[in-house]
């Protein structure tokens, strides 16, 4: 249970960071990195 929860949170953070990079490069200009 604890391992599954930790893995899910890790996957969520990883996916979010990837999304931020993509939005930063291909965004509408509101996110400027």
UniProtKB/Swiss-Prot annotation:
Keywords: Electron transport, Membrane, Photosynthesis, Thylakoid, Transmembrane, Transmembrane helix, Transport. One of its GO terms (cellular component) is cytochrome b6f complex. The chain crosses the membrane at residues 2-22. The keyword Membrane applies. It is found in: Cellular thylakoid membrane. HAMAP family: Cytb6_f_PetN (MF_00395). Belongs to the PetN family. Signal peptide: none annotated. It comes from the Bacteria. SUPFAM superfamilies: PetN subunit of the cytochrome b6f complex. GO terms for biological process: cytochrome complex assembly; photosynthesis. This is Cytochrome b6-f complex subunit 8. Component of the cytochrome b6-f complex, which mediates electron transfer between photosystem II (PSII) and photosystem I (PSI), cyclic electron flow around PSI, and state transitions. It comes from Synechococcus sp. (strain WH7803). It is a single-pass membrane protein. GO terms for molecular function: electron transporter, transferring electrons within cytochrome b6/f complex of photosystem II activity. The keyword Electron transport applies. The 4 large subunits of the cytochrome b6-f complex are cytochrome b6, subunit IV (17 kDa polypeptide, PetD), cytochrome f and the Rieske protein, while the 4 small subunits are PetG, PetL, PetM and PetN. The complex functions as a dimer.
């Amino acid at each position: 249970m604890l391992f599954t929860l930790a893995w899910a949170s890790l996957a969520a953070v990883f996916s979010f960071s990837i999304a931020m990079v993509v939005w930063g490069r291909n965004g509408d200009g509101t996110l400027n990195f």
